Amino acid sequence: MFAKYLKKPWIWTTEPTCRNFTRKHSVKGKRTPDIGQDLIKVFEHNGIPVRLTEKEECCGMPKLEQGDLETVDKYRQTNIPELVRLIDEGWDIVAAIPSCVLMFKQELPLMYPDDPDVQKVKQHMFDPFEYLVHRHKAGLLNTEFSQELGKVVWQVPCHQRVQNIGPKTRDVLALVPGTEVEMIERCSGHDGTYGVRAGTYDKSQKIARPVISRAKKMDA
């Protein structure tokens, strides 16, 4: 698991962007820990501090999509106080999964508009590449890339697109010399648990076919 990979919290500073960073643990720590580990390496390379939350639950997006509002609220009661505590210590929040970012940026604030703590978390939640763009604008991103990436096919996550932050992943990848980013702006069919449940798996595969087909044609 990703939490075991880190072994203990890391605390760094990101000045002069006046932002600190907390990486929100998520499903990627259990199923694809390498993604979280790679993100840590990228941030390390750029001198960005990283710390895992010590107490947390799922962001609640899968339960929200199933209409289980009681569990969503249960997760909120665990997550929000912990994140607010870290924010008050000077940290910002980043999650590797767009759905998690969207949950804290948009869904929970809409569900709890009068909760000041939910609104505070909203203001300090960032997509990882959005955060890197902030660093770049402040002149703090390490752009001394040693290897070209060639052609990169990027399927724009639906839950990232609706955050209205722009194609920040493309913007960062495009900084690497000799890199061509091809964007696919179609749904992957995954949608949280939709792509893994027995009752919806076949439908999710059908939705994903155009994305897979385009990726193959692009010959990345």
Q: Model-predicted segments: where are they?
A:
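Iron-sulfur cluster-binding electron-transfer modules in prokaryotic oxidoreductases
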Residues: 1-220
